[in-house]
Amino acid sequence: MKEELKKSLRTYGALLLLGVTGVPLGAAVGLIEALFCRLLLKVTAIRVAHLFWCLPFLAMAGLVIVAVNQKFGGRGKGGMSLIFDVAYEEETELPLRMIPLAMLSTALTHLFGGSAGREGVAVQIGAVFSYFAGKKLPFKNAPGIFLVTGMAAGFAGMFGTPIAAVIFAVEVLAAGEMRYEALLPAFTASFSASAVASLLGIRKENLAVHISESLTPFLLVRLITLGIIFGITGGLFAWCLKHTKKYLGEKIKNPLVRVFSIGVILSILFLLLYRGRYCGFGTNLVEAVFHGEKVYAYDWALKFILTILTLSAGFQGGEVTPLFTIGATLGAVLGNLFGIPVELSAALGYAAVFGGGTNTLLAAIFIGGEIFGYDYLPYFFIVCTAAYVFNRNSSIYCRQKLTKYSC
């Protein structure tokens, strides 16, 4: 009895210590994320103010990105794939140089007009920093636990959604499985990172929806149908990204030639298509949806295509923010077709296409709750569940373990 009590006390003591350790780790990650976010906001402002000076140099920026990563990246060129390999213990090292290289590459992509996000880099920053710290700490399985902890902190520091960040980090590595051993430090690190980033002026998107819509059987059918469409869209994005990268890699084997040639094409397209409307994160399109500004029926499709081309060419950045944009703009179009308030359908698309693209369920539901308000959690649950079932196990993270069933 005494031995069992001692064992329990040691277990709970270690668990508590893990949770406490997550606080300073999260704070450090939150500081880095805040600086990174400010950098991205600054280069975005420069691009918007001087679009016709920046876009012509997109191809040249691509050359710099690829050349620098080829020379200095080493194994770190694997990006999120390397993060997943380390989580599965197929690799054992995450070089610290991944952090500055990823930040520089993403900043150049956005300065010169590429269509990309920031989440992938934010998660990499958190994962690399926390994994490195975890190797110095005297905990069992510390590097793996703190890898997940850092992913949560990175997501929360960038997006200001700590609950969704925790769930995303423990859910995303293997579809259908949760890394519960990292739950407590991920929780404390996530809230710590979010708080520090907020203190430094980084605010989450607040896109509250103010619509009263009773959940009738007819609405339920329409919500499920929306979820199916959103899930297919997110899954299709992941599938197209994977196969476009493969196709371009086979057709244009030299990465410098590939990024330059496609960069030239992209710079022309971005200029012709509403003068940079589809450059960058796409938050301008999300704001247009929720502020009642002009939204074209094909906005989502053009953002879809241009983001895939940008990332497949060799430019750097995440996929999640474009997924939010694709979902919101597609949702705005479908809301009119399905007789659902545009704000509500756009909010549902924002979360569900993210879930369909990342092959996550709970993270998508809570992203919806944290961004748009928890009053609509039942709607997010219905739509995101349908999206998760119908995304066909596709994921933007090609190294994600697919343990959930296939439809």
Model-identified regions with their sequence ranges:
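Alpha-helical transmembrane segments and immediately membrane-proximal extracytoplasmic
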Residues: 1-407
